[in-house]
Amino acid sequence: MSNKNNDELQRQASENTLGLNPVIGIRRKDLLSSARTVLRQAVRQPLHSAKHVAHFGLELKNVLLGKSSLAPESDDRRFNDPAWSNNPLYRRYLQTYLAWRKELQDWIGNSDLSPQDISRGQFVINLMTEAMAPTNTLSNPAAVKRFFETGGKSLLDGLSNLAKDLVNNGGMPSQVNMDAFEVGKNLGTSEGAVVYRNDVLELIQYKPITEQVHARPLLVVPPQINKFYVFDLSPEKSLARYCLRSQQQTFIISWRNPTKAQREWGLSTYIDALKEAVDAVLAITGSKDLNMLGACSGGITCTALVGHYAALGENKVNALTLLVSVLDTTMDNQVALFVDEQTLEAAKRHSYQAGVLEGSEMAKVFAWMRPNDLIWNYWVNNYLLGNEPPVFDILFWNNDTTRLPAAFHGDLIEMFKSNPLTRPDALEVCGTPIDLKQVKCDIYSLAGTNDHITPWQSCYRSAHLFGGKIEFVLSNSGHIQSILNPPGNPKARFMTGADRPGDPVAWQENATKHADSWWLHWQSWLGERAGELEKAPTRLGNRAYAAGEASPGTYVHER
């Protein structure tokens, strides 16, 4: 595979990787129901359907006569090969497809269905039309060229890759070469040690790399559905290493990968375990409080913890950073498109019957929400071009999924359904009611403009639930790339704004734009809240919490 193609796959992976807020899936039953609604519409409105068939016929005539102006969107890189525009046959093939796709979307969009049924119908039609894109066939000009360049070997290699995926990957195209990485060898390599372990988590303390460190430590809490080393990928992408260079005493949680035996672990179980880790960090560093960072579902866990501390009158968290975390679950995106009472209850029932929610199941669901980027992209690369799956650390991490205990999954579903964090005392954790307005610590909330899992508008509303001072920052990236955003990227941008109106769009219109990574802005913010500089410790842990196994520990290797 050429470097250009490999770079393009990596770019799309960075923007569309699914480090998840695990709540629900899309049931096949719901998709079939929406498909039936679409088919019934053709019968119920025959004149409406005939009008669009006639319009498609007129456009098809223009295509055949070479008079059509239809062209793919400028950012649709599937059709970058010059043959799609220069070759008359390929150009007509493409324009016929574009005309058909447009007419189907217009047909359902202009129907008399309800807005929800129109959105669902458009989603189903999009699944069908993207699957039938001309780039997904052996007539793809890039595949034809590759076939002749390799003397047919690309076709044999593609069939071999397909056979492997049918056997080993549930028939889904592999997104990454899983043999290219090993956690602890070329991922998660920052030096440190496990200084505390319980049934739920391991606490890793990283070795300082500066002569002085801030007195107040930082505890990083990753999402439970994926593994912690998203914060410690390659050295140049490692947020943990960046924190160490910024003189932060850095600790990170590594969650255990639960099995059916842990099916009863709920949110309170994770909070109790996290409280033990907080006490260990404070005992090791001698600080009376710490700063905390939570991402995705880890951000929900951190939020529940600080709400619990507020109810107890304990001030163990000085400042909280939330990365792409939705607490106000009023959402209007594809994640919520098929959500209703039946869907939520079915999702809970499914995980309770299995004992756990498999992360691989959630990854498949979300892949079908972005089929071009997360399925057909790799279909073309692996099968039509006969290339090996790309070697990319983010994709390896994304495919190294974990499970969620049924009880915790049920808790997340109930939060999604009833939105309790938006109301005082509507959620109870570890025996205490949660009122986020009583949480007075400073909040740094980061969201991504292109995030299709945790929409930035929802993150903005979520930040306003707290009673402390808020710093909201909007990065020009997707879900995971918002987190993995090291300085020096010439395309990186972020926005800040002191005024915080209730309307997210109003905030965006008046926000200040900045070049480079939000990491720089965050470290400045965090440094002001991290205490005085002191001599860095020369050893990890202490007498009560002795340094044990070297990082990345044991739990990260559990499958």
UniProtKB/Swiss-Prot annotation:
GO molecular function, one term: acyltransferase activity
Record-annotated active site: 296
Paired cysteines (S-S): none
Metabolic or biological pathway, per its Swiss-Prot or TrEMBL entry: Biopolymer metabolism; poly-(R)-3-hydroxybutanoate biosynthesis
Enzyme class: transferase
One Pfam family hit: PhaC_N
EC number: 2.3.1.-
Gene Ontology BP terms: poly(3-hydroxyalkanoate) biosynthetic process; poly-hydroxybutyrate biosynthetic process
Record's keyword terms, sorted: Acyltransferase, PHA biosynthesis, PHB biosynthesis, Transferase
InterPro entries: AB_hydrolase_fold, PHA/PHB_synthase, PHA_synth_II, PhaC_N
Function: Synthesizes poly(3-hydroxyalkanoates) (PHA), complements a mutant of P.putida that does not make PHA.
Family: Belongs to the PHA/PHB synthase family. Type II PhaC subfamily.
Further facts: P.oleovorans accumulates poly(3-hydroxyalkanoates) after growth on medium chain length hydrocarbons. Large amounts of this polyester are synthesized when cells are grown under nitrogen-limiting conditions. When nitrogen is resupplied in the medium, the accumulated PHA is degraded.
Protein name: Poly(3-hydroxyalkanoate) polymerase 1
Originating organism: Ectopseudomonas oleovorans
Gene designation per UniProt: phaC1
